[in-house]
Amino acid sequence: MTLFFASMAYASGDSGHGPDWGNFAFRVVNFVIFAGIIWKAAGKKIVGFFTGRRQGIEQELNDLETRKTEAKKQLAEVERRIANLESERQAILADYRAQGENIKAAIIDKAEKSASLITEQAKRTADNEIKAAIDAMRAQMADEIIVAAEKLLAEKLTANEHEKLIDKYLTKVVLN
């Protein structure tokens, strides 16, 4: 409250000080001269600086807008790829399955051919073994027949008849 009354006391007093218009005019003239000198000396550079700065900002904004547009295009491309990723995955899997089925069919075909070749070879081997066994049996039977025939001839033929029979067959063999 004391401050309130003190401010009223000071406000009511006439101190006789008013604005010093001469000093103010001197300051304004001084500022105008100083601004004129600066404008005369560096006005074009200042204007060029602000104009260049303005153009630089405009160019930077245009570049940023271009980059923003390119980024949107790239984002759309990436989103499209992501959307197509599942279909691409399905296509790749289908391709690998088809290749697998082809390889499987080729392996089965090769195995069947090998099995048929092995079966055919086993049949030939069995046939050859049967023929060899039959030939061996025939040879053994021929030997046994010869032994039996010799025994029978030895019992029924005399030595003189035996000699005649040998000469007869030797003559046939030599003449033929």
Swiss-Prot record:
Record keywords, A-Z: ATP synthesis, Cell inner membrane, Cell membrane, CF(0), Hydrogen ion transport, Ion transport, Membrane, Transmembrane, Transmembrane helix, Transport
Record membrane topology: Single-pass membrane protein
InterPro entries, per database record: ATP_synth_b/b'su_bac/chlpt (IPR002146), ATP_synthase_B_chain (IPR050059)
Taxonomic superkingdom: Bacteria
Localization per record: Cell inner membrane
One cellular component term from this protein's GO annotations in UniProt: proton-transporting ATP synthase complex
Major site of localization recorded for this protein: membrane
Keyword Transport: yes
Membrane-spanning parts: 24-43
Gene Ontology terms for molecular function: proton-transporting ATP synthase activity, rotational mechanism; proton-transporting ATPase activity, rotational mechanism
CDD domains for the chain: ATP-synt_Fo_b
Function noted in UniProt: F(1)F(0) ATP synthase produces ATP from ADP in the presence of a proton or sodium gradient. F-type ATPases consist of two structural domains, F(1) containing the extramembraneous catalytic core and F(0) containing the membrane proton channel, linked together by a central stalk and a peripheral stalk. During catalysis, ATP synthesis in the catalytic domain of F(1) is coupled via a rotary mechanism of the central stalk subunits to proton translocation. Component of the F(0) channel, it forms part of the peripheral stalk, linking F(1) to F(0).
Subunit structure: F-type ATPases have 2 components, F(1) - the catalytic core - and F(0) - the membrane proton channel. F(1) has five subunits: alpha(3), beta(3), gamma(1), delta(1), epsilon(1). F(0) has three main subunits: a(1), b(2) and c(10-14). The alpha and beta chains form an alternating ring which encloses part of the gamma chain. F(1) is attached to F(0) by a central stalk formed by the gamma and epsilon chains, while a peripheral stalk is formed by the delta and b chains.
Family statement drawn from the similarity comment of this UniProt entry: Belongs to the ATPase B chain family.
Protein name listed in UniProt: ATP synthase subunit b
The organism of origin for this protein: Nitratidesulfovibrio vulgaris (strain ATCC 29579 / DSM 644 / CCUG 34227 / NCIMB 8303 / VKM B-1760 / Hildenborough) (Desulfovibrio vulgaris)
